[in-house]
Amino acid sequence: AQYGRELLSCVPENPDQSILDLGCGTGTLTHALLEKSASVTGLDSSPEMIAKARQLYPGMDFRVLDARLMPWRNRFDIVFSNAALHWIPDHGTLLNAVSRVLKPQGKLVCEFGARLNILRIREAFRTALERRSLPYTTRFYFPAAEEYGSVLEQAGLRPETMKEFDRPTPLKGGPDGLRNWACQFFREDLNNLHEEQRIQIFKEMEDSLKDELWDGSQWVADYRRIRVTAAR
């Protein structure tokens, strides 16, 4: 959420506008968006995340919903999203839904993983799986800016700004930071493995990444981001 506050600067202030926070998680940035507008809705596909958001920010409008199935039409002036859209592989369907819920001249303001995002970590994980003859499935969408411009246009959205940039990001947890992060990010691949297998995979990842991503006190993930604003 601390990095998401940079993205907030791309959202204009207007008390009369309506904002949708897509992939809102536990609602930290949804609540911060009240500085920009009095009408803010948070949406996430995780019931657990939304339950926490409602607990933290009672009285705010939070919905459990798949972003590709949003029911509204011409409803929001701004669709905002931070660090969420890479979890949705099918951006054609997603952006058609975003275009549908935006009002005419409404804007998409988003940031998520770009091409080469966590490349070193993904390759270390893939290698550890392949060593055990286990398949690695790409479950994320990390586009390049030039590629994403075409995807936006096909959904009826006009790109205004697109920027790719590196964002080395410290992982919480000290020596356990990488494996804690991997448990979350690669959970679908790890869920079917025995605990001993998971521990061995984490150890191999740590050994192969230590020279590049361990700074002596914490793991620093090789994040790369794309920041986009587009208009309907």
Predicted regions and their residues:
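Short alpha-helix
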Residues: 141-155
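C-terminal helical/coil "lid" or tail adjacent to the Rossmann-like core of SAM-dependent
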Residues: 160-215
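A short SAM/SAH-binding and catalytic strip from SAM-dependent methyltransferases
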Residues: 78-91
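Conserved alpha-helix/loop element of class I SAM-dependent methyltransferases that forms part
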Residues: 1-17
